[in-house]
Amino acid sequence: YLIFPSCASRVLAADETGVSSSEYLVKIAQNAGVPVKILDKYSSHCCGMAFDSRGHQKIGTEMNIDLMNFLNDKSELGAIPIVIDMSPCTQFMNQRKSDLTLIDSTEFLNRIQNKLEFEPNDESIFVHPVCSSQKMGRTTDLIEISKRCSTSVETSLEPFCCGTGGDRSLRYPELPKNAFNQSHPDLKSQKGISSSRTCEMGLTESCGIKFSSIESLVYHSIKK
């Protein structure tokens, strides 16, 4: 497996340790005995979603094509699966037809979970499958792997949008606060888990509990 660190995960560390989601993925894979490698020169590339979603489709498409060509070369024309550490980026990239095998980190963690020895705790966690996970039909990946980490997992009965919308919550912080309060006015969990760094930041600011990455949760829940 090859790992492509998303722009948001590169810039915005997954937790207070400063360890990124991709770095956690490497540590987890090593624990499982699964060979992985973070792509060289990944910092020169972006999937283009940040530009496309702001209306700059031309530059977004150009960056996406450039990244796809880069990944095609590094993966030996699609022979090596590529893991992406942020669900919105995975979903955006999979919209473009290619010979690449692009895997979301939640799917990757589910693939290797039986190679890991979990030490679940009883800390209650709220698990939020982001919109892109819902669109990919992969919401159960996040929930199932979270249940290996905690004996008390809470999630929404119905899928909902947290209102973060990429960087929109940075400009309009009232969006995630309003979206979450309407969906879960009586949240009792001690911490939150998701698979998008920007959503984690927006939810942390809006709902009163800290949201972290699924990679961080898994790493801190396995026997070292």
Model-derived features: positions:
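Iron-sulfur cluster-binding electron-transfer modules in prokaryotic oxidoreductases
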Residues: Y1-K224
